Amino acid sequence: MVLPVVAIVGQPNVGKSTLFNRIINQRLAIVEDKPGVTRDRNYAQAEWMGHKFDLIDTGGITWEGGKIEDEIRAQAEIAIEEADVIVMLTNVVNHVTDLDERIARLLYRTKKPVILAVNKADNPEQRNDIYDFYSLGLGDPIPVSSSHGTGIGDLLDEIVNDFPAEKDSEADDVISFSMIGRPNVGKSSLVNKLLGEDRVIVANEEGTTRDAVDTPFTKDGIKFKVVDTAGIRRRGKVYEKTEKYSVLRAMSAIERSDVVLLVLDASTGIREQDKHVAGYAHEAGRGIIIVVNKWDLPEKNSTSAKEFEREIRSEFQYLDYAPILFVSAKTGQRIDQIPSMVKEVYDNQNQRIQSSVLNDLLLEASKLVPTPMIKGKRLRVYYMTQVSTNPPTFVVFVNDPELMHFSYERFLINQLRQNFDFTGTPIKILPRKRK
């Protein structure tokens, strides 16, 4: 299901990251009283009154400065393009500035719902000052205090009221997957071979595919949507604005995918950039399949696949759950296995385990390995329940979450994998204090 997207934008140092953290109720964005701290967009899922949505935090928009400021503005412009609803955050202490007016004009041209929020309205006198912001022409300003939380509920009410009408429920039946990787590993060729036609421009130049292209297709009665992304370059090589857009669109494709195919090049082996690319998908919590393309090129023997697989497992230890598929876009070798493997991973990441079964597993796990002890205090595990899917997320109720050592968390994840088929999907464990 594609969730509504909400973007928080504004000039530097008005409290966007603090508002972002307040809405998602956790500190994900770096917050510092210094303009330009948030350079990249931060994504997180949020929920208000039963309405789930994707929230984007952006860096401060400015038309002054140098290359870094231009890149930050490009990031924000992409967020604006992706958003269904835009929150323009201003600061009552600064009053209305020329920069506020320029940003307001930019947002007005989008023809999208824009909600004007005035931050740092911490007392009645400051709340009276918000009337100056009517001059921006964006409707009624909403006074908020990101740091204290006042007015956030009113803001969220307004946000969900502006969400677009829900799309046809048939969209829920479509399995979305994207192919990611550094440039020139053959992603576009894989898409064309998979679809049986030239949908994406293919050339032997890096960066041929600038945009991410969504293409629906049906295989064995199952509906899929494949997103072929522009190759992700090493950060030091991202100079042109168009290349910056390519990286941003690839990130967006990952966010919009159920399953991500990490494409490696068998002819060049694993590069450092492959690890960065894999990290994007892993951190997003998406299902992952490792696809080794150009398997027709290197000289091989009977042990070549096993040797390459060992190298993959060594270099991508955090992706030990991801299946590996050796293919050739040129010859078509094993391309027909991609849809069924995507469907298998999708099913695995959406399965639910009954709480009674999970607690039987916990009991058996406690007999295998004792719970950790820190400073003379032992972790006590009471029960476990699954709270969400895609990725499978489990809450473990304990006496003190601080006692949940990462090694024991990993042990519980391994127990889940041994007892249930979670091939291709990450698993999240969330320790919570029993009330």
From Swiss-Prot:
Domain KH-like as annotated: residue spans: 351-435
GO molecular function: GTP binding; ribosome binding
UniProt-listed Pfam families: KH_dom-like, MMR_HSR1
Superkingdom of this protein's organism: Bacteria
Functional note: GTPase that plays an essential role in the late steps of ribosome biogenesis.
Name this polypeptide is given: GTPase Der
EngA-type G domain segment(s): 4-167, 175-350
Record-listed GTP 1 binding positions: 10-17, 57-61, 119-122
Subunit structure: Associates with the 50S ribosomal subunit.
Similarity field: Belongs to the TRAFAC class TrmE-Era-EngA-EngB-Septin-like GTPase superfamily. EngA (Der) GTPase family.
Residues bound to GTP 2: 181-188, 228-232, 293-296
Organism: Lactobacillus acidophilus (strain ATCC 700396 / NCK56 / N2 / NCFM)
Keywords recorded for this protein, A-Z: GTP-binding, Nucleotide-binding, Repeat, Ribosome biogenesis
One of the protein's GO biological processes: ribosome biogenesis
HAMAP family referenced in this protein's UniProt entry, alphabetically: GTPase_Der (MF_00195)
UniProt cross-references to InterPro entries, sorted A to Z: G_ENGA, GTP-bd, GTPase_Der, KH_dom-like, KH_dom-like_a/b, P-loop_NTPase, Small_GTP-bd
